[in-house]
Amino acid sequence: MTTATEKQTAKGRKILLTIVGIPIVIILLSTALYFMVDTKIVDLGTVNNGTLITPPLRFSELPLLGLDGQVQDYGKPEPKWSYVVFGGAECIDDCERMLYLTRQTHIALAKKMPRVQRLYVSTEGSVSDYLQGQMKQHYADSLVATVDNTALQKMFSTSGIDPLQKNSFFVVDHNGWLMMVYQADDLQQHSLNSLGKLVLKDMRRLLK
């Protein structure tokens, strides 16, 4: 009799825990979904043309340095969305084409252009004189910074993505979350044009 009562009591407790637990789980999932939609990591009812990085990476915590060696605060003077290209002291071939692509898609944002900035990040502690000249001549409104490669690789370690993979650039939201990557199939102009249109489609939606 006692055993049957104990079993019934245990069963009742499990049912009670289930009843109490389900709303908690729903609340937690709803909160997570709300955060992802609110920060535009997820846009319900739409499909991103870039590859979402989940969970997003805290780019704003990377120890970025300006070319003068001073700490560069990602969020200053004001928070903006960013196109980020990672490379070395030199940026040629596929790397330079990503600078070109991000510049063109940035310009094409028109009225929304001021809400986005472009950033080139060298993992080699500096950039060459040649690259500095190229940046001034062709990409004067792009920011340039350096970062320790070990710190960069550590940030990406859980994502399964190589930050230095060819033909690619990243999108960081205005809150400092690195949340999307685009990669061109090749460097042919028609391929870059096609990718640029997809980037614009995503960015115009994200910047609403």
Predicted regions: what they are:
Residues 119, 134-166:
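Short, internal strand/loop/helix patches
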Residues 83-85, 118-121, 171:
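Structural beta-sheet core signal
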